[in-house]
């Protein structure tokens, strides 16, 4: 019994001790768990602080970026606003100047009207004075002569009319002279303004081009066997080729600037290539002609763009470029037309006209000169017909006619073109009359030869002392060539005046070409 009790007590004591030990262990684990939880909480809190800090930095950077963009945009808007404000201020200033000018004109008009009213008042007073005198004279006449009042009135009125007419004529002449002087003063001022705002360049056109040659061997190859190459060059190119003892130089002479420029380019390419023979000459000539056509169009487009013009037909643009190879009285036609365009624009603007339209009329006023080598007629008629065909502005057509006196100028722009044309032509050194007379004679010489049937082309060479005529071998035989030369010589002798004699050289060449396949 006692043993059982002792065992029970021991069991109870063991359970108590086990409970205490277990509780102690659990308490220790709990404390460890709590510490771990606290550590994790601190780690999470630290990580959250880092995330929050990064978020704040991102928000701050975003705010700075937005602020920077806002400031840049605000600065740009402010700059645009300032620019527009400046432009508006300039326009407002210009408007104020125009208003002041209108005000001055209005004041001048009011003064003129007042002056006219004063004159009218003076005239009325004179009329009253003459009427009083007339009444007195009528009474005297009635008593002294026994004339009726109507008869006396006729005598007096006739006398008064003669006296009044003299006085009125004197007044009219006075104000007409004042108006002319004022108009002349304003015209001189406008011309001075135009010429001071434009500074053009001028270089007189020559009749020769000099081509540099490396050595005399190349000269011999250009001449060819028995002069075959140089003859082919002169016949194909229509120029004079002068090869003398001058070292390192060949001279190309021709009054036609376009032919001379093409000839110079062809010879330069042949010298560079080294293959100089008739077939190669014709091949290079055809190639250069195509290149010049493209270059002429580009030149015209550049000029139209520089002048700020638009909607000009491509054919007219090409002819503008072709003016570069035309000359009048030694003055390059393109340089002259550009000068007229700029001056006409300035003059028209000063007179209250359309500056762009005046420039357009100025560049086209001599456009017919680009056609005179290919068509019959004056450059005025050719240019006007061309502009009518391509529906140019009526002011342009009127300017073409008016600048040579074929029509009266009907607008400010046309009058500006006429004035600019006169200014450009009258400038000292701008033109050479003697050279132009020579060029005209040489051109007439070619025209006479080309007017005959069966003629392919004609070139005046040797300073107009020889005309080389290329006949169509299929239309003209050998016998007809002789007659053709005599006819041309007779017509030249009949229609032209020239010193010495002119040689007429008719060339008939038949070529047969076939290809072996």
From Swiss-Prot:
BP GO annotations: mRNA catabolic process
Domain KH: 207-273
SMART domains, A to Z: HDc
Membrane topology: Single-pass membrane protein
GO MF assignments: RNA binding; RNA endonuclease activity
InterPro entries reported in the protein's UniProt record: HD/PDEase_dom (IPR003607), HD_domain (IPR006674), HDIG_dom (IPR006675), KH_dom_type_1_sf (IPR036612), Ribonuclease_Y (IPR017705), RNase_Y_N (IPR022711)
Family matches, as Gene3D superfamilies: Hypothetical protein af1432, K Homology domain, type 1
Spans through the membrane: 1-21
Keyword vocabulary terms for this entry: Cell membrane, Endonuclease, Hydrolase, Membrane, Nuclease, RNA-binding, Transmembrane, Transmembrane helix
Alphabetical list of PANTHER family matching this protein: RIBONUCLEASE Y
Catalytic EC class: hydrolase
EC number, as in UniProt: 3.1.-.-
Function: Endoribonuclease that initiates mRNA decay.
One Gene Ontology cellular component: plasma membrane
Subcellular location: Cell membrane
Protein name: Ribonuclease Y
A Pfam match: HD
Record-stated family: Belongs to the RNase Y family.
Domain HD as annotated: residue spans: 333-426
């Amino acid at each position: 019994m006692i043993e059982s009790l002792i065992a029970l007590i021991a069991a109870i004591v063991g359970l108590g001790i086990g409970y205490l030990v277990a509780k102690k262990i659990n308490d220790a684990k709990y404390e460890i768990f709590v510490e771990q939880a606290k550590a994790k909480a601190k780690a999470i809190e630290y990580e959250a602080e880092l995330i929050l800090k990064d978020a704040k930095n991102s928000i701050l950077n975003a705010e700075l970026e937005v602020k920077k963009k806002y400031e840049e945009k605000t600065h740009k808007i402010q700059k645009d606003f300032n620019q527009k404000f400046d432009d508006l201020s300039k326009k407002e200033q210009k408007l104020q100047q125009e208003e002041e000018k209108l005000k001055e004109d209005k004041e001048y008009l009011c003064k003129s009207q007042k002056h006219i009213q004063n004159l009218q008042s003076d005239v009325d007073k004179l009329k009253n004075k003459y009427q009083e005198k007339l009444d007195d004279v009528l009474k005297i006449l009635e008593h002294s002569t026994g004339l009726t009042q109507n008869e006396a009135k006729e005598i007096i009125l006739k006398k008064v009319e003669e006296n009044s007419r003299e006085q009125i004529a004197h007044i009219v002449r006075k104000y007409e002279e004042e108006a002319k002087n004022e108009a002349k003063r304003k015209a001189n001022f406008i011309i001075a303004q135009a010429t001071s705002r434009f500074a053009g360049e001028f270089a007189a056109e020559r009749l020769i081009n000099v081509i540099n040659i490396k050595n005399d061997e190349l000269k011999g190859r250009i001449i060819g066997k028995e002069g075959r190459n140089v003859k082919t060059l002169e016949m194909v190119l229509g120029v004079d080729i002068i090869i003398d003892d001058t070292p390192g130089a060949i001279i190309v002479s021709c009054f036609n600037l376009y032919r001379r420029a093409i000839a110079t380019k062809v010879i330069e390419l042949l010298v560079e290539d080294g293959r100089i023979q008739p077939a190669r000459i014709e091949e290079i000539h055809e190639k250069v002609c195509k290149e010049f056509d493209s270059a002429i169009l580009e030149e015209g487009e550049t000029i139209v763009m520089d002048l700020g013009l638009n909607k000009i037909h491509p054919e007219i643009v090409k002819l503008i470029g072709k003016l570069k190879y035309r000359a009048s009285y030694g003055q390059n036609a393109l340089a002259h037309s550009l000068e007229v365009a700029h001056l006409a624009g300035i003059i028209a603007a000063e007179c209250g006209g359309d500056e762009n339209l005046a420039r357009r009329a100025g560049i086209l006023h001599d456009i017919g000169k680009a056609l005179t080598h290919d068509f019959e007629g004056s450059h005025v008629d050719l240019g006007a017909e061309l502009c009518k065909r391509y529906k140019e502005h009526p002011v342009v057509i009127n300017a073409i006619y008016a600048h040579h006196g074929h029509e009266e100028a009907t607008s400010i722009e046309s009058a500006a073109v006429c004035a600019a044309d006169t200014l450009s032509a009258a400038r000292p050194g701008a033109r050479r009359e003697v050279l132009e007379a020579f060029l005209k004679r040489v051109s007439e010489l070619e025209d006479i030869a080309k007017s005959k049937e069966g003629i392919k082309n004609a070139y005046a060479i040797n300073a107009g002392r020889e005309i080389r005529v290329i006949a169509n071998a299929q239309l003209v035989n050998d016998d007809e060539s002789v007659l053709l030369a005599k006819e041309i010589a007779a017509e030249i002798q009949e229609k032209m005046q020239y010193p010495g004699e002119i040689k007429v050289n008719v060339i008939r060449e038949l070529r047969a070409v076939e290809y072996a396949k």
